[in-house]
Amino acid sequence: MTNTATSVELDLQVAVEGVELPSVQEMELWVKTALRDSMDQAELTIRIVDVAESQMLNSTYRGKDKPTNVLSFPFEAPPGIELPLLGDLVVCAAVVKQEAIDQNKPLNAHWAHMVVHGCLHLLGYDHIEDIEAEEMESLETQLIESLGYNNPYQEQ
């Protein structure tokens, strides 16, 4: 399916204070871009969290006792029921900011990358095996560049 007009219902939950965040409109654009060739419509939640919540969730669901940039929780509908629910993304604002600084990237460009990256995970993409990683990174690069940002995997 090629669809440049994906309809997105975004539930944005901000569970952290005093951080610089992209606008809801930017996040919706990034989600629509990530989903444009996969879904006509989608509903998802993006929850912005602090380091403690990110670390707790990463430890609980991935067995890694440290905060991470983005976690993806796909929604799986019961068999025979089709719903536009894609799932949830949990993004740690502090980790995204520090990574942007460490990688010498504009903060919004890194936010865009993390949202696109998380959406691709919700669609079933992964980067555990090298071949999967190459496919996912190639698609991410195309999507991020279509948004006007630099290749996220090249040093800035």
From Swiss-Prot:
Binds 1 zinc ion. The keyword Membrane does not apply. Zn(2+) binds at H117, H121, H127. InterPro entries: MetalPrtase_cat_dom_sf_prd, YbeY, YbeY_CS. Its EC number is 3.1.-.-. It comes from the Bacteria. GO terms for biological process: rRNA processing. GO terms for molecular function: metalloendopeptidase activity; RNA endonuclease activity; zinc ion binding. Its cofactor is Zn(2+). It holds the Pfam family YbeY. Single strand-specific metallo-endoribonuclease involved in late-stage 70S ribosome quality control and in maturation of the 3' terminus of the 16S rRNA. Belongs to the endoribonuclease YbeY family. This is Endoribonuclease YbeY. It comes from Shewanella piezotolerans (strain WP3 / JCM 13877). The gene is ybeY.
